[in-house]
Curated annotation (Swiss-Prot):
Stored PANTHER family: 4-HYDROXY-3-METHYLBUT-2-EN-1-YL DIPHOSPHATE SYNTHASE, 4-HYDROXY-3-METHYLBUT-2-EN-1-YL DIPHOSPHATE SYNTHASE (FERREDOXIN), CHLOROPLASTIC
Keywords: 4Fe-4S, Iron, Iron-sulfur, Isoprene biosynthesis, Metal-binding, Oxidoreductase
Species for this entry: Corynebacterium efficiens (strain DSM 44549 / YS-314 / AJ 12310 / JCM 11189 / NBRC 100395)
Name this protein carries in UniProt: 4-hydroxy-3-methylbut-2-en-1-yl diphosphate synthase (flavodoxin)
Cofactor binding: number and manner: Binds 1 [4Fe-4S] cluster.
Any one GO BP annotation for this protein: terpenoid biosynthetic process
InterPro entries: Dihydropteroate_synth-like_sf, IspG_bac, IspG_bac-typ, NO2/SO3_Rdtase_4Fe4S_sf
Reactions this protein catalyses: (2E)-4-hydroxy-3-methylbut-2-enyl diphosphate + oxidized [flavodoxin] + H2O + 2 H(+) = 2-C-methyl-D-erythritol 2,4-cyclic diphosphate + reduced [flavodoxin]
Gene3D superfamilies: Dihydropteroate synthase-like, Sulfite Reductase Hemoprotein, domain 1
Length: 378
């Protein structure tokens, strides 16, 4: 069983609530040059369609800051400006109407001395600040204290020190992240942080790597923390299309039952017993059901060993063998079809089942905006 959500203060990032009273949100970051407004808005639209709740954009140059007002206004989801090095861009982002600002206190010039101004501006605008501490860019004072190592204790101390400066100026609409590229150190840092404050926590493994490796690192780290009730918003960092970050993040939450499960395709990993090309069959079924946004479990099994049992546990499934496929609905065999008709039959039955679902269930599924994804089981 999962531990109860850790109680936190509540923030509003635009229209999205962040904190223990709200569902855990999934974020991503654009990979476009922010000053290329059309490209940035196009990517934000793609992220929104994939289920992204909040999007972050980089702001390294004056031309990027100049683009923020249009992007913040036209984006269908809340925009967070990601600020490093130059504190002036914090004020540009606030003036532009961004829903929140992420600051990295480890690399912004003389940040401590600007906290009062930032707190005043953010408070007047009514937007939150995320203090984003990163193992690769810790404040030199903290690094010196911890002998040059970005330990969990160093990450936590840096974050809470900066938060205390904001609190001294009467500003408390703060979220915190303490990211590290090592998921073990990252998990420990968040555990320590969770015990010492009530700020909402943004989870992330920084520099997680390419799609496969990054997915593994983030899944391990997020699973460990979320199962303990720690985490209020997540970003899966991948060296891949940002849409993939949303798919992974959403699936992590669904796997932990922290989001309603949507269309799930269960397929066996295949072995020498398989009497059908399971990989091809699963891919074709997934492609055919893409866009069917309902809580439906479809099993695609390659033989009669695991097939009937797995298919019976699903809403709809097939157990293949001898050039045929037995189609199951809620554990009952409804028909046997030639192998060439399996995909089309499953698609037709899935559509039929979807039409009979409770309208409220369908409405909730449609509101989630998520599409089919393959889940491979063993």
């Amino acid at each position: 069983m999962l531990a109860p959500r850790r109680k936190t203060r509540q923030l509003m990032v635009g229209s999205v609530g962040v904190g223990s009273d709200h569902p855990i949100s999934v974020q991503s970051m654009t990979t476009t040059k922010t000053h290329d407004i059309n490209a940035t808005l196009q990517q934000i639209a793609q992220l929104t369609a994939s289920g992204c709740d909040i999007v972050r954009v980089a702001c390294p140059k004056p031309v990027d800051a100049e683009a923020l007002p249009i992007i913040a206004k036209k984006s269908p989801i809340p925009v967070i400006a990601d600020i490093h090095f130059q504190p002036k861009y914090i004020f540009s982002a606030i003036d532009a109407g961004c829903a929140a600002v992420r600051v990295n206190p480890g690399n912004i010039k003389e940040f401590d001395g600007r906290v009062k101004e930032v707190a005043q501006a953010a408070g007047d605008a009514g937007i939150p600040i995320r203090i984003g501490v990163n193992g690769g860019s810790l404040d030199k004072r903290i690094l010196d204290k911890y002998h040059g190592k970005a330990t969990p204790e160093a990450l936590v101390e840096s974050a809470l020190w900066e938060a205390s400066l904001f609190e001294e100026h009467g500003y408390g609409d703060i979220a915190i992240s303490v990211k590290h590229s090592d998921p073990v150190l990252m998990v420990e840092a968040y555990r320590q942080l969770a015990e010492k404050c009530d700020y909402p926590l943004h989870l992330g493994v920084t520099e997680a790597g390419p799609k496969f490796m990054g997915t593994i690192k983030s899944s391990v780290a997020f699973g460990a923390l979320l199962s303990q009730g720690i985490g209020d918003t997540i970003r899966v960092s991948l060296s891949a299309d940002p849409v993939e970050e949303i798919k992974v993040g959403d699936q992590i939450l669904q796997s932990l039952n922290l989001r309603p499960r949507k269309l799930e395709i269960v397929s066996c990993p295949s072995c020498g017993r398989a009497q059908v090309d399971v990989y091809k069959l699963a891919e074709e079924v997934t492609e055919g059901l893409d866009g069917l946004e309902v809580p439906l479990r479809v099993a695609v099994m390659g033989c009669v060993v695991n097939g009937p049992g797995e298919a019976r546990d699903a809403d709809l499934g097939v157990a293949s063998g001898n050039g045929k496929g037995q189609i199951f609905v809620k554990g009952e065999i409804i028909k046997t079809v030639p192998e060439s008709q399996i995909v089309q039959t499953l698609i037709e039955e899935a559509m039929r089942i979807a039409e009979t679902m409770d309208p409220e269930v369908l409405a909730a599924a449609e509101a989630s905006g998520m599409k089919a994804e393959v889940k491979v089981t063993s």
